[in-house]
């Protein structure tokens, strides 16, 4: 298994405001799991504007790669207003984040799935140690493109009629199972795209197709693209004659709804979240949606609680706004 490495050092300096140093390091993983670490350290040289010095300390967050982009942005914004707080944000996956929180080795475990109910304090089980905070929601959209100026797609449980904009999940799975992610459906060439990087979005899609692989997330030879944006750009690029592109992205990255496939007739929209969730579960092996969570060992307090409250805030420019900016769905 190839471990991806990313190193980025960005320094911004001002005599009047806090200096933010962001260091991104990809760490060789244990047990085949890649962990991306971002250390966001704030060093104050002076104060400008309304800075909150009432909370201080260090926060170590690890877990879901779906929540990771939000956590990085939220941490950066929070520290700009709270210069006495340093935040370390890591990936590693939901299971990793939950387990580390259970063992009290981190301050916040990030997850795009719920922990076992017997481990959650609010469920009332003896011996439970995790305090659960529901952060937001995620919806994964199947996207398709045949190059036509007007398109309408619908994923069904067992019927394929490409001429009518329909494709069955069985045919989608067949394409993703092909050695190169390309197969023929009703005399059309269907080319699949997936994520080249580790992604909770891909993990969700892989489970829905029942093509999940312990190392690669999605057990497919489909062409890999970097990030939601990379998959979106690849699928929406003009396809060759008699070719259809197919892929998947988080809802927030759908820039034109004509490419987003319905699920058994249910639209992939934030307003239609519940019905889309039910339909995707009926069509596939699991849902193409999930809630997003923060887990702490016991009830959060101090800087950890202040940061969580910032993430839950629907004030302009705060947590729930940031959540939508990175392609997720607010509470």
Per-range role (PLM):
Residues 1-11:
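N-terminal leader/signal peptides at the extreme start of proteins
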Residues 13-107, 111-121, 126-331:
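Exported/periplasmic ABC-transporter solute-binding proteins
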């Amino acid at each position: 298994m190839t471990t991806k490495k990313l190193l980025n050092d960005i320094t911004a300096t001002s005599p009047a405001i806090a200096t933010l140093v962001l260091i991104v390091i990809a760490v060789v993983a244990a047990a085949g799991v890649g962990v991306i670490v971002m250390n966001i350290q704030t060093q104050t040289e002076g104060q400008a504007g309304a800075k909150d010095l009432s909370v201080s300390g260090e926060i170590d967050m690890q877990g879901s790669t779906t929540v990771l982009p939000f956590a990085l942005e939220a941490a950066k914004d929070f520290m700009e207003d709270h210069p006495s707080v340093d935040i370390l944000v890591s990936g590693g996956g939901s299971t990793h984040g939950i387990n580390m929180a259970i063992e009290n080795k981190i301050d916040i475990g990030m997850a795009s799935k719920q922990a076992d109910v017997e481990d959650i304090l609010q469920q009332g089980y003896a011996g439970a140690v995790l305090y659960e905070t529901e952060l937001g929601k995620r919806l994964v959209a199947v996207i398709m493109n045949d190059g036509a100026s007007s398109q309408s797609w619908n994923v069904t449980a067992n019927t394929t009629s490409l001429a009518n904009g329909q494709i069955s999940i069985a045919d989608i799975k067949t394409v993703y199972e092909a050695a190169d992610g390309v197969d023929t459906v009703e005399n059309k060439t269907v080319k699949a795209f997936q994520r080249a990087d580790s992604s909770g979005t891909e993990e969700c899609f892989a489970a829905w197709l029942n093509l999940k692989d312990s190392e690669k997330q999605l057990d497919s030879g489909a062409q890999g693209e970097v990030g939601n944006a990379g998959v979106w750009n690849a699928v929406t690029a003009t396809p060759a004659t008699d070719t259809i592109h197919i892929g998947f992205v988080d809802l927030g990255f759908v820039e034109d709804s004509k490419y987003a496939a319905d699920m058994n007739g249910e639209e992939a929209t934030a307003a239609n979240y519940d019905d889309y969730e039910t339909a995707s579960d009926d069509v596939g092996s699991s849902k193409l949606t999930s809630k997003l969570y923060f887990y702490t060992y016991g009830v959060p307090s101090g800087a950890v609680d202040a940061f969580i409250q910032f993430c839950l805030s629907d004030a302009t420019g705060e947590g729930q706004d940031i959540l939508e900016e990175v392609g997720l769905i607010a509470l």
